Every structure is written in structure tokens, then in C-alpha cells.
Amino acid sequence: MRNPDTLGLWTKTMVALRRFTVLAIATVSVFLITDLGLPQAASAYPFWAQETAPLTPREATGRIVCANCHLAQKAAEVEIPQAVLPDTVFEAVVKIPYDLDSQQVLGDGSKGGLNVGAVLMLPEGFKIAPPDRLSEGLKEKVGGTYFQPYREDMENVVIVGPLPGEQYQEIVFPVLSPDPAKDKSINYGKFAVHLGANRGRGQIYPTGLLSNNNAFKAPNAGTISEVNALEAGGYQLILTTADGTETVDIPAGPELIVSAGQTVEAGEFLTNNPNVGGFGQKDTEVVLQNPTRIKFLVLFLAGIMLSQILLVLKKKQIEKVQAAELNF
């Protein structure tokens, strides 16, 4: 006849096995998280950024240089997978939302639709996928969108635009991930992705001059003695100040909100603000996942599940033996 303490021994064994299982899972989880968390080793014309910042569109402060010309802040979004495998094509979806009913001031002062543009900074080694790697479905999403590298030697930084905003509030970038097995300079890990996207014309040209998509101010305090409408559009204001008279030219586009005889302070607005566009920036991350690690993780989890099943079967076997002993 067996010792009746068998049940107590079995209980202690089960507790020990469960503790080991929990510890093993926690260890693997911490390993994965820490390893993946740190990497190893004046219109919507994005190419104007190349003139002002030929080396990189991202300043040391983290700001995309498009913000130097597009002064208004607007929303921008980028959607990418949380993790991708090496040598895989995936979608980076850029969203540039705005009110489709809005009209911007064009260069000649007339109103028109907004254009959109974007610059997408991918991790080193990532690039726009070649056409022969795109599926039929992805080709349809991309359409005729033309993607251009920021520099010839910088395939991971891509610019697009200007594009008609009515059709391209959502732009699909087909991205090809690198393969560390083929390129030893690339490592697995988590990497940053930066987006800069604008809609509408900017307020400042790369030369530093103001565009007509601005609110214009009085340069000095004084009285507006004359308001002359120009034949080509816009206005010429004669401002009488304490030092004499001064001419203020207002280009075609902004609406005048002052009149002759009105006294203004220095810096007071003379026109409305016609700008309906703006720039948005978004930062996110993508993980270049090691497929071998995934295989080992699957095997590890399968082993845990198998051990749990065997433990349950063993428990039932012991319970049957104990029941037989009690009946004996």
C-alpha cells in the first residue's frame, strides 16, 4: 500500500513547476522587450526643404524644416506595422486631413484648392520598394504617386508632392525593409520613423520673403492717409507717421481690414489671415524583427503548453492510483 502523503508531494511538485513556468516566461519577455526596445549597433512643395537643408530635413531639435515656411500647425498621421520581417514590403500610410471645402489664396491672389506634400524619414536601410516587389493590390493603392529620395545617397528619406489634396489626403508609401543577413551594417531592433506633412501654401519662401498667404501688419504706428487699389491686384497704403509718410504694399490675396483715416499701432494687422493650410509632424517607431527569434519563441511557448498538458494527464493518473489505493 502507498504512502498517503503522495497527494501532498504531488501538490508541492505542481507548485514548483508553476513557479518555474512563470519565471521562464518572465525572463523571455524581459529579454525580448529590452532587446527590441534599443536599436543595435511656401507651397506644398517638399523639395523646397532641400534648398534650405540639403543634408537632412530634420534639425537637431527634432523639427522638420518644412515648419520654417509653413508656420501654421496642423494634424498629420502615419500608420505603419508595429514590427516587420527582413526583406518584406509593407505599407506606410500618411494621412493629411483638412476641410475639402476650404480654398487657399494662390500666387495671383485668386482662390483655389490646396496641394499636399510630405517627407518620410525611414530608418537606415529602409527604402521605397521597387515596382516588381509590389502586389497588384498595393500597386492600385499607390497609383501614379512619384516618390523621390531626399538625396541621391539617402534612399531612406523620401519626399512626395505637390499633389492635389482632394485626391491625396491619404498617401500610401510602399516600403521595403532591409535584410541584416545580406547587409551587415543593418541590425535588428526598434527604430524611429519621422513624418513631416503639409497642406496648402507656405507663408515664407526659401529666400526669406513673405508670400501673399500671410496677414500683413503695420510697420509703424500712424494714420492711414490713403488706400489705393492696384490694377494688378492688392493695395498700396500711405501711412503717415511721426517721422513722415511711409508706403505699405499689400499683395493680392489677403483682405484689407483697415480704411483711410484709421489710426493703427505698430504691428497691428492691416489684413485678415488668408492661410487655411499648415504643417504637421508625427514620430513613430518600427521594429525590424528577427525571424529566428520568433521561431524560438513559438517553440518555447509550444513546449510550455505541452508540459502543461502532460502535467494535467499525470495528475489524472495519480488521482486514479490514489483512488484505487483508498478502495483497496
Swiss-Prot record:
Topology in the lipid bilayer:
Single-pass membrane protein
Q: Where does heme bind?
A: Y45, C66, C69, H70
Tell me the Gene Ontology biological-process terms attached to this UniProt entry: photosynthesis
Entry keywords, A to Z = Electron transport, Heme, Iron, Membrane, Metal-binding, Photosynthesis, Signal, Thylakoid, Transmembrane, Transmembrane helix, Transport
Transmembrane regions listed in the UniProt entry: 296-313
Signal peptide residue numbers: 1-44
Q: How is the cofactor bound?
A: Binds 1 heme group covalently.
Recorded GO molecular functions are:
electron transfer activity; heme binding; iron ion binding
One GO cellular component assignment for this chain's record is:
cytochrome b6f complex
Cellular localisation? Cellular thylakoid membrane
**Which cofactor does this sequence's record say it needs?**
heme
Identify one Pfam family in the record: Apocytochr_F_N
Instruction: Supply the InterPro entries for this chain.
Output: Cyt-f_TM (IPR024058), Cyt_f (IPR002325), Cyt_f_lg_dom (IPR024094), Cyt_f_lg_dom_sf (IPR036826), Rudment_hybrid_motif (IPR011054)
Q: Which PANTHER family match?
A: CYTOCHROME F, PTHR33288
Q: Which NCBIfam families match?
A: PRK02693.1
Cited function = Component of the cytochrome b6-f complex, which mediates electron transfer between photosystem II (PSII) and photosystem I (PSI), cyclic electron flow around PSI, and state transitions.
Q: How does it assemble?
A: The 4 large subunits of the cytochrome b6-f complex are cytochrome b6, subunit IV (17 kDa polypeptide, PetD), cytochrome f and the Rieske protein, while the 4 small subunits are PetG, PetL, PetM and PetN. The complex functions as a dimer.
Family the UniProt entry places it in? Belongs to the cytochrome f family.
Name of the protein: Cytochrome f
Q: Which organism is it from?
A: Synechocystis sp. (strain ATCC 27184 / PCC 6803 / Kazusa)
